[in-house]
């Protein structure tokens, strides 16, 4: 779950299964989005989904809401292991889990990464706050 008011490093990519441009705010979210796009069991991907009718929904968004090929929805939140037990992270994950359970979605999970990858790998389109992405902007 992310705070939509936070301005941070942004990676953009067009995924085949996402109807809009995919925005990732860290390397874990970016890599997992690509993995979902390549997964034959996933039919559709929505990223950074607003929590409608949730008091925190104006500011926080779920990382991934997907529709599987069997028609069932799936929700995933991306978290780095070192942030997993921080009180705010726990609070946001609980909000997300309870929100989606209230909508009848039981396939809710957390994607955990041991480490943060360097963003300096070639081929990742990067835009910084206040900067628009352009294909020539690779770090």
Regions found by a protein language model. Give the residues of each.
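Electrostatic, structured charged patches in enzyme active sites and in nucleic-acid/phosphate-binding
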Residues: 1-139
């Amino acid at each position: 779950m992310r705070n939509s008011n936070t301005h941070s490093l942004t990676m953009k990519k067009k995924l085949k299964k996402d109807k809009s441009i995919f925005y990732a705010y860290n390397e874990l979210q970016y890599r997992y989005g690509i993995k979902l796009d390549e997964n034959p069991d996933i039919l559709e991907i929505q990223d950074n989904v607003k929590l409608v009718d949730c008091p925190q929904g104006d500011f926080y968004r779920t990382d991934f809401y997907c529709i599987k090929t069997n028609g069932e929805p799936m929700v995933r939140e991306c978290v780095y292991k070192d942030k997993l037990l921080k009180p705010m992270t726990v609070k946001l994950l609980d909000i997300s889990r309870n929100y989606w359970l209230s909508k009848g979605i039981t396939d809710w999970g957390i994607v955990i990464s041991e480490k943060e990858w360097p963003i300096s790998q070639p081929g990742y389109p990067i835009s910084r706050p206040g900067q628009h992405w352009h294909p020539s902007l690779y770090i």
